[in-house]
């Protein structure tokens, strides 16, 4: 049996507690689950050919949530690289690199969002981990999980408000690796950022009205690698278009922590 985070042969990861991220999508929730520890879920080319291998670019990563939200990069020099460190696997982003879903993800049926990531930033520049739409600041019904220049992680969300409602977690000076959680609801307005299993900040400022939108999801950069490029790593990324219970949050954070090599 492969341990958590060493899922080389495509077996669905299940934590030692029995938690499986697929359970987050059991009721038809929209979203995505990207798992760099599952080498069978990745390919070198954006058309889904050429098996992924360590130290080579990744141009295609399957969505394991069952929503078919495959993320790709058609331009060869904009692809992240699959890396291994001991039992851990991750996508390394350097410079103008990023992935984007081949199709949009239709979150128009929900105004709640749960975002979980295992990420590392190597610099204290502004950089995206995940962003719904090509520019969340200019698109209603979007969110953004990112690093902000300085020592901050940020989760931001909006409905039809004039701008994003931001929550920041401070004192995370690069290089640093963390489990990041963003939770938000538009109609019952809250935006929460958690780091390593602990809530760090929240806001109940109005995000306007409406639901999340039908947009592409960007990973590791804005607009298909066009800006806010991450200099760092992504070990795990789970996007769920629904609110999550305390048990679901705790289980998912523990799962992501094991994938990332972080102790909660």
Where are these regions (language model features)?
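GGW-centered surface loops in extracellular recognition modules
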Residues: 2-70, 116, 233, 244, ...
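Extracellular glycan-interaction patches encoded by glycine-rich segments
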Residues: 158, 212-239, 244
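Extracellular/periplasmic catalytic domains that process cell-envelope and extracellular macromolecules
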Residues: 24-29, 83-85, 108-110, 147-148, ...
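Short beta-strand segments enriched in hydrophobic/aromatic residues
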Residues: 38, 119-121, 183-186, 223, ...
């Amino acid at each position: 049996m492969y341990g958590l985070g060493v899922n080389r042969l495509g077996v669905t990861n299940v934590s030692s507690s029995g938690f499986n991220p697929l359970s987050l999508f059991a009721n038809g929730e929209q979203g995505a689950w990207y798992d760099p520890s599952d080498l069978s879920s990745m390919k070198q080319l954006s058309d889904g050919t050429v098996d992924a291998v360590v130290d080579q670019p990744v141009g295609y990563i399957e969505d394991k949530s069952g929503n078919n939200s495959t993320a790709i990069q058609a331009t060869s020099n904009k692809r992240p690289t699959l890396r291994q460190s001991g039992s851990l696997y991750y996508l390394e982003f350097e410079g103008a690199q990023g992935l984007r879903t081949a199709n949009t993800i239709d979150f128009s049926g929900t105004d709640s969002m749960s975002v979980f990531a295992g990420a590392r930033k190597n610099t204290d520049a502004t950089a995206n981990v995940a962003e719904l739409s090509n520019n969340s600041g200019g698109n209603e019904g979007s969110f953004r999980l990112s690093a902000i220049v300085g020592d901050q992680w940020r989760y931001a969300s909006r409905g039809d408000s004039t701008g994003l409602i931001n929550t920041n977690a401070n004192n995370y000076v690069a290089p640093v690796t963390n489990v990041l959680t963003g939770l938000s609801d538009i109609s019952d307005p809250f935006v929460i950022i958690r780091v390593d299993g602990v809530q760090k900040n929240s806001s109940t400022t109005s995000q306007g009205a409406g639901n999340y939108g039908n947009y592409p999801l960007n990973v590791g950069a804005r607009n298909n690698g066009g800006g806010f490029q991450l200099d760092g790593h992504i070990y795990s990324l789970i996007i769920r278009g629904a609110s999550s219970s305390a048990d679901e949050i705790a289980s998912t954070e523990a799962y992501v922590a094991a994938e990332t090599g972080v102790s909660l």
